[in-house]
């Protein structure tokens, strides 16, 4: 059993070695460790989903639950269900929810996202978000550590699994929000359409204006009519190499808390 320790005088909870709190701002924090943490893509996806206030929301493959916590920081949905298959990540997420005193707003479910029938109400959700593994099995080196392997490669679920799961959960007109690598764009669009989700809104993400896009954000609507809108490119940095104005807005109080 890992040793427990207090993270500071007056803190209400106890955490394990190797874990720390990322303070997102507005009184919301998320517990992370070396395996289960989050990056810029997660923050961009959480913002791309907004507004979520008053909605029934699901985060598939939630990991440490950063998307769910960012939603709570910005504009709380009516309820969030965070689905995650890995025991260690689920334990982290449950303690994060408890630390933030959000048990009434967030349900953490340890389940395989491919087997949610009977575990969650089908056709009842307003939105589903997922930051899926980007690499197919056989593409690149597979990490020996299980947690990192599941996060990076499609060993526990494929993009087709994610889209089918979301389609089952969503009500008619509900949306699935994804982020993915540009080289997988055709796979993602095809998987959405095969699941009955019509791609409606896309945004490319570039590090700087002169750099090629490596990431894209995509919204697919259940039962939506064909017609995809490509939004302006999201630039991470401006011409000086500093965060762009939009990135400063998206990071918001989170970045200020880290500095």
Question: Predicted regions: what is each one?
Answer:
Residues 2-17:
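N-terminal auxiliary segments of SAM/dcSAM-dependent transferases
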Residues 15-56, 62-64, 69-74, 219:
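SAM-dependent Rossmann-like transferase core, predominantly class I methyltransferases
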Residues 29, 79, 105-107, 198-201:
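Conserved beta-strand segments of alpha/beta enzyme cores
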Residues 38, 156-207, 211-213:
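Conserved Class I SAM-dependent methyltransferase catalytic core
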Residues 47-141, 164:
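Conserved SAM/SAH cofactor-binding pocket of Class I
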Residues 132-161:
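Mobile active-site "lid"/loop adjacent to the S-adenosyl-L-methionine
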Residues 212-259:
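SAM/dcSAM-binding transferase cores
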